[in-house]
Amino acid sequence: MSERMKYIRNFCIIAHIDHGKSTLADRLIEKTGFLSEREMDKQILDNLELERERGITIKLKPVRMIYKAKDGNEYELNLIDTPGHVDFTYEVSRSIAACEGALLVVDASQGIEAQTLANVYLALEHDLEIIPVINKIDLPSADPERVKREIEDIIGIDASEALLTSAKEGIGIEEVLEAIVKRIPPPQGDEDKPLKALIFDSFYDNYKGAISFVRIVDGKVKRGMRIKMFSTGKVFEVTEVGSFRPDLYPVEELKAGEVGYIAANIKNVKDTRVGDTITDADNPADSPLPGYKEVVPMVFCGIYPADGEDYENLKEALEKLQLNDASLVFEPDTSAALGFGFRCGFLGLLHMEIVQERLEREYNLNLVTTAPSVIYKVYKTNGEVLELDNPTKMPPPTQIDHIEEPIVEATIMVPTDYVGPVMELCQERRGVYLGMEYIEKTRVLLKYEMPLNEIIYDFFDALKSRTRGYASLDYEFKGYKKSDLVKLDILVNGEVVDALSMIVHKDKAYEKGRKIVEKLKENIPRHLFEIPIQAAIGSRIIARETVKALRKNVLAKCYGGDVTRKKKLLEKQKEGKKRMRQIGTVEIPQEAFMSILKLDDQK
C-alpha cells in the first residue's frame, strides 16, 4: 500500500430519517474548516428543495474534507452520503461498496429503526468497520445506555465505545473525526494496475454532460484518457476529473483509493449506470467489480396531464427528470377516459411520490395519476407468459391459466403496545406470518411475507396511523408466487372506464368493487337520464349503483283528470329518457378519479 493511501479514509453515514445524518455531516464539514460559516447552508448535502422539506436524502452528494488529526498528520476524509429509504436500497449498497467504514447514527431518544437495520446489514456484508454514534444526547428524553444495549442486541456489534454526540449543539464532533481516522481502515488498491472505478452515483450537468461519481479501486484516471464502461462497452474520452469540495473541483488525476468525479461528454445518464465499473479503454481490467445489477422498476402508474394541452410539457419534464434519474422509465400511453399520457415505472412508492411532486412543483404541471400497480406474470393457456404492468392489457379470463404476483419480505419494527393492530393489518393485507423477536422489552421485530401489491397502495400510511407513527417498515423483494387474482372493471353507463381497471385478489374484489361504485355515485353529477355504475369481473357484475335521472315534472299541468292521461305522459317521458340513454355520453369529472385513488385512506 502506498504511503499516500495511508492517509485516506472513505466512509458513509447510515441513519434513519430524522436521526440527524445531514446535520452531523454539516458539523463535520464545518469542523474541518472546509467551508466558512457564511457558506454553511443548513444541510449542505441535500440539494433538492424537496429533500430539505421532507428531511430525507434522495440524491447523494459526496464531499472531501482535510482533517489535521491529533497525531499531527493530515488526512483526506471522503464522506459518501447514502439515501435512507427502502426504495433506494440498491443505491445504498453501491455507496457502501465505495467505503471502508460507516458511522451508524442513532437517535438517543428513539433507538434503532427497521430501515437503519437493513442498511447496517448491507454494510456488514461489505465488511465495513462500523462506528456507532449516538446523536441528539442534548434531548431531555435521551437514553444513550438503552440505545447502546439495543445496538449490541440487535446488530451484535460492540457499542461500549459508541460516541455520544449532539450534532445540533456541536458536541462530540472532534471525537467522531478522531474515530474515523483511528478505527476506519485505509483503502486497499494498486495504482499501477489497470484502472477500475466504481460508479456510485451520477448526475446530469447542462454543460459537461453526465458526470459519474466514482471511487477509484485500482489504477488512475486523468484528462484525455479513453475510458470504457463494462456494462455497455461504450468508450468515452475523459474531459475532466476532480474531487468534491462540496462543489466540483477539477484536479490533475485521481488515483487508487480516492473518491471523485469523471466527466467525459456522456450524453445520457443511462450510460453511467450506478454500480457499473469504468476501466481504461486501451488497457482494460480483466473483470468488472462485483455487485452490479440493472435497476428494475417495481411500481407502475399512469401519469396524465389534467389539461390535454400540457402533454408536450409533461413529456419534456419527464425527459429532463430522466436525465438525472436513470431508474425512472416511461412510455407513452393513451386512455379513453384520460386522453394521452405516460405509463411510468418507479423503484417504489416514495420514488413515485417524489417524481410526481417534482413534476407538479418544478414544472408547474397539473397531473392525474392512476392507481399504482406492480408487474404481474400471466401464464396463458397456450404456454405464453406475459409480464403485465398495466391492468388494461390483461387477456380475457378464458385464456389465463394462472397469475403470479411479486412477493416481498417485510420487516416491521413496532412498540410492543401496537403488535396486535399491526398483525391484524398484515393479515388483512394477505400477509403470511414468518416470525417475531423481542428487542429489549419495549419493541418487537415482526417479519411477514406479503404481496407487493398490498404494500404499494397505502400500507405505509395505514401502518403509521395504527401505531401513531411509531412503526418503521423495510421490505425486500423475494420473488413471484401463484395467486388468485382477477381483473376488476368499472362500467359507467355500460362502458368500461379503462383508467379505473385494477387487478385485485378474488376475496377482496367484491368489497373493492362495491366501494368504488359507491364513491363514483357520489362524484358523478346527475344527468337527464339515469346512469348505471357497475363493477364487473369478466362478464359477471358484482356491484351496482345508479345515479338517478334529473326529470321534469310532466304531471304538473294535469289537475285531477284521468289516471290513464297521467300514465301516458309518464310513459312518454320514460321513452324519451331511454332514447337519451342510448345516445347520451357521461362525462366523468376529474374529482371522481381522485376520490377513488384516495379510497383506502378513509378506513
UniProtKB/Swiss-Prot annotation:
Q: Which UniProt keywords apply?
A: Cell membrane, GTP-binding, Hydrolase, Membrane, Nucleotide-binding, Protein biosynthesis
Source organism of the structure: Caldanaerobacter subterraneus subsp. tengcongensis (strain DSM 15242 / JCM 11007 / NBRC 100824 / MB4)
- InterPro entries per UniProt: EF-4, EFG_II, EFG_III/V, EFG_V-like, EFTu-like_2, G_TR_CS, LepA_C_sf, LepA_CTD
Q: Name one GO cellular component term.
A: plasma membrane
Please name the NCBIfam families in this protein's record: lepA, small_GTP
SUPFAM superfamilies documented for this protein: EF-G C-terminal domain-like, P-loop containing nucleoside triphosphate hydrolases, Translation proteins
Which major enzyme category is it?
hydrolase
- What domain of life does the native source organism fall in? Bacteria
Functionally, this protein is described as follows: Required for accurate and efficient protein synthesis under certain stress conditions. May act as a fidelity factor of the translation reaction, by catalyzing a one-codon backward translocation of tRNAs on improperly translocated ribosomes. Back-translocation proceeds from a post-translocation (POST) complex to a pre-translocation (PRE) complex, thus giving elongation factor G a second chance to translocate the tRNAs correctly. Binds to ribosomes in a GTP-dependent manner.
Task: Return any one Pfam family short name.
Answer: EFG_C
Q: Which GO terms describe its molecular function?
A: GTP binding; GTPase activity; ribosome binding; translation elongation factor activity
**What CDD domains does the entry give?**
EF4_II, EF4_III, LepA, lepA_C
Can you give the residue ranges of the tr-type G domain?
6-188
Cell location: Cell membrane
Has the keyword Nucleotide-binding been applied to this entry? yes
Q: Which family does it belong to?
A: Belongs to the TRAFAC class translation factor GTPase superfamily. Classic translation factor GTPase family. LepA subfamily.
Q: What is its EC number?
A: 3.6.5.n1
Q: Which GO terms describe its biological process?
A: positive regulation of translation
Q: Give the protein's recorded name.
A: Elongation factor 4
Could you tell me what reaction this enzyme catalyses? GTP + H2O = GDP + phosphate + H(+)
Membrane topology value? Peripheral membrane protein
Q: Where does GTP bind?
A: D18, H19, G20, K21, S22, T23, N135, K136, I137, D138
